[in-house]
Amino acid sequence: MKFGIEFVPNEPIEKIVKLVKLAEDVGFEYAWITDHYNNKNVYETLALIAEGTETIKLGPGVTNPYVRSPAITASAIATLDELSNGRATLGIGPGDKATFDALGIEWVKPVSTIRDAIAMMRTLLAGEKTESGAQLMGVKAVQEKIPIYMGAQGPMMLKTAGEISDGALINASNPKDFEAAVPLIKEGAEAAGKSIADIDVAAYTCCSIDEDAAAAANAAKIVVAFIAAGSPPPVFERHGLPADTGKKFGELLGKGDFGGAIGAVDDALMEAFSVVGTPDEFIPKIEALGEMGVTQYVAGSPIGPDKEKSIKLLGEVIASF
């Protein structure tokens, strides 16, 4: 099992750099930085992380081809690869409709858009010209091939991830979700003449770890509430939860009733949408994900009640694998 960690660049960048360095020191192999217009710029953040670290692989987790053109992303990730001496990795997904509506961007044909974007970026990163004549001239990646991970959720995206990417970043925390997802990734990989072993299947989890299990759970409840609000009925049915659960949380959060939303998060929702607990409780939960085909565990928001302490505790977990 490989281990990655996610950071949202909404804090001072110096703090994020220190936390990523700590993560590197305790055994994390990947740092994923979210890319959203209302936070600090992902590539400027990554550049400073590259300067402040030595071995950890790093990249956006995830960007999208609507807000950023594939050519701009290719140039940015190649530059990051140079700055980090060959440690760049790229996460790209279809984005979310709510963000595009707010920006006035039309969200059309996500599967074919991602497919075309990855094809263009691979061409540019190889130093070749696209059919339309685009070519990177003043920047060249250190790696012969920068790994490209696809953020994927639905069946078509999961199959496409298996077909054209080096890894799949899946926003899920429960083995049941990977029991459903991994066969679709495998189907896509085999259709392209590859094996599922060629794809790094990453569980991008809602993670909260602490020596106090209750404190860990409490820190994750607001994140679980937002995950529930954005999940479609089939996901709830998979976990034996009422299909209208998402609607209920959407209404609570929509009117700003965060206390009500947190209070409505029960143990069943926590089990479905998060990995929380003490270090001893984490180990079997991560092992269960591995049994379903997960090959990278990503500690996503909130990480824990105290990020620095929680990263150190995750280091204890990593040492068990």
Curated annotation (Swiss-Prot):
Entry similarity comment: Belongs to the mer family.
Catalytic activity annotation: 5-methyl-5,6,7,8-tetrahydromethanopterin + oxidized coenzyme F420-(gamma-L-Glu)(n) + H(+) = 5,10-methylenetetrahydromethanopterin + reduced coenzyme F420-(gamma-L-Glu)(n)
Subcellular location: Cytoplasm
Pfam families per record: Bac_luciferase (PF00296)
Protein name: 5,10-methylenetetrahydromethanopterin reductase
PANTHER family: 5,10-METHYLENETETRAHYDROMETHANOPTERIN REDUCTASE, PTHR43244
The organism's place on the tree of life at top rank: Archaea
A single cellular component GO annotation: cytoplasm
Database matches in SUPFAM superfamilies: Bacterial luciferase-like (SSF51679)
Function: Catalyzes the reversible reduction of methylene-H(4)MPT to methyl-H(4)MPT.
Quaternary structure (record): Homotetramer.
Top-tier EC class: oxidoreductase
The UniProt record lists the keyword Magnesium: no
GO molecular function (one): oxidoreductase activity, acting on paired donors, with incorporation or reduction of molecular oxygen
InterPro entries: F420-G6PD/mer, Luciferase-like_dom, Luciferase-like_sf, MeH4methanopterin_reductase
Pathway, per record: One-carbon metabolism; methanogenesis from CO(2); methyl-coenzyme M from 5,10-methylene-5,6,7,8-tetrahydromethanopterin: step 1/2
Species assigned in the record: Methanothermobacter marburgensis (strain ATCC BAA-927 / DSM 2133 / JCM 14651 / NBRC 100331 / OCM 82 / Marburg) (Methanobacterium thermoautotrophicum)
CDD domains registered for this protein in UniProt: Tetrahydromethanopterin_reductase
pH-dependence annotation: Optimum pH is 7.0.
Keywords: Cytoplasm, Methanogenesis, One-carbon metabolism, Oxidoreductase
Predominant location: cytoplasm
GO biological process: methanogenesis, from carbon dioxide; one-carbon metabolic process
EC number(s) recorded for this UniProt protein: 1.5.98.2
